[in-house]
Amino acid sequence: MELWFSEFHTPDVKHSLRVDRHLYSKKSDYQQIDIYDTPEFGKVLTLDGNVMLTERDEFIYDEMITHVPMAVHPNVQDVLVIGAGDGGVIRELVQYSDLQHIDMVEVDPLVVEVCKKYLPKTACRLEDPRLTIHYEDGLKFIRSRQEEYDLIIVDSTDPFGPGEGLFTREFYGNCYKALKEDGILINQHESPFYPGDAAACQRAHKNIVESFPISKVYQAHIPTYPSGHWLFGFASKKYHPLKDLDETRWNMRGIPCRYYTTTLHKGAFYIPAYVEELLKHVEKEY
């Protein structure tokens, strides 16, 4: 008998993956955690029945949420990552030799433990000496920080359950205070395609625009995420994601990527008309 994993993207749409083995299943204090082994996408991590990553396409998300700000900010030394218990963002960040310290705040220790065991290619750099892992609520952690970070990356789950508070105006305001005077905030912005996801995307962007002087949106195409069309938010106190992009400086680093390039960086900020329409009432002009 064939085993399939299915995730509903809307009440009328579901995405299914054939499963070879169900490797892990446990409910933590925060959420249901499962690992599946699939023939097409390799190992798959789901939280509360929602795909968080697959071995085959996680590089797209992790490269785009990490390297876009790193190619813009001229001197990132201190980074805060909220979420990211799978380790993919950390794997990308530690390739920057001049980065001095990373605080990673993950509410669920079991996510980190499971990913270290079952997703070693993603969680392979969680022992880097520059990394400090804090197992606590990101909402509470950020409230006590003042002008400490050059970059904050919010690699949260979807805007419900444990990750719900990471999309609020209060949270983005606290991120602003935690950033240095030229700091950048990056967050995953959900998909703009299905109406329910689009509404969450619009709310999150509105809250960011009200907190930061520079707020833009960029995109990537991730096969296993709802609709495959995914947005990220770029919010900054000083730097513009295109005007301040330093292609030469970033390319000289020689960081190997499978998705991100500085050419793609520029194109990613040119969003489709339907997304412009969704965000036009809250987007600022620069």
Role assignments for model-derived ranges:
Residues 1-34, 227-286:
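SAM/dcSAM-binding transferase cores
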Residues 1-63, 67-69, 95:
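Rossmann-like AdoMet
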Residues 2-4, 53-182, 194-201, 279:
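The AdoMet/dcAdoMet-binding core of the Class I SAM-like
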Residues 50, 189-190:
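Glycine- and acidic
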Residues 172-173, 198-219, 233:
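Conserved Class I S-adenosyl-L-methionine
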Residues 182-189:
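Conserved beta-strand signature within the Rossmann-like core of class I S-adenosyl-L-methionine
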Residues 187, 213-218, 242-245:
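Acidic/polar loop patches that form or flank catalytic/metal-binding clefts of enzymes
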Residues 220-224:
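Short proline/glycine-enriched turn/loop segments at secondary-structure junctions
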